[in-house]
Amino acid sequence: MRVRRTVVPLSLLLLAATAGCGKEATGPTGPSPGRSFLEGTWSGTLTIERPGEPASTGQVTWTFQTVDGTNLQSFRVTIRSQHAWLPITTTVTSAITPSNQPPARISTQGDYASPRGCTGTLLSVGNAETQTINADFSGVDCSSLPNSTFTGRVTLTKTG
């Protein structure tokens, strides 16, 4: 009788241990990475200053999409500017440091098709909080044209 009591529990243990062998995983194998606080739409103002010109301000929207495999620290960003001198829509890249949580330093850079018929470059560095981004904004529009460099600021609030 003693042998039978040992064999039955051992058989059940072996059956349970091998039940999943040879099968593909059907669910998540690790924790979900979640969403970044930056994901979504941010709206606000873009102020641009150019040599010999007064500062001017226009509306701007940035939409952040997290790049997979970057610990929620790198993003594709679509910028839609309604600024009179820089009416552009472009997709650039952003990164945040030192972690993926606010407050964070944010750096954004990329190229855009200038309304003046060339390729411009932009750079923005600043601070990202849970609901606001405040950063400088600079670049070179058409380097062959006068007053092609610009500086300024972008101030954004999370809207979606």
Model regions and ranges:
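Bacterial N-terminal signal peptides that target proteins for export
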Residues: 1-10
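Bacterial N-terminal signal peptides
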Residues: 9-17
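Bacterial signal peptide processing site
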Residues: 21-24
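N-terminal helix-cap/turn-to-beta initiation motif at the start of protein domains
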Residues: 26-43, 67-68, 158-159
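Short, aromatic- and cysteine-enriched interfacial helices/patches
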Residues: 29, 37, 85-87, 116-117, ...
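N-terminal leader/targeting helix
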Residues: 38-60
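Beta-sheet ligand-binding and adhesion/scaffold domains
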Residues: 44-48, 71, 97-160
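N-terminal glycine/threonine-rich, aromatic-flanked beta-hairpin/loop signature
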Residues: 53-99
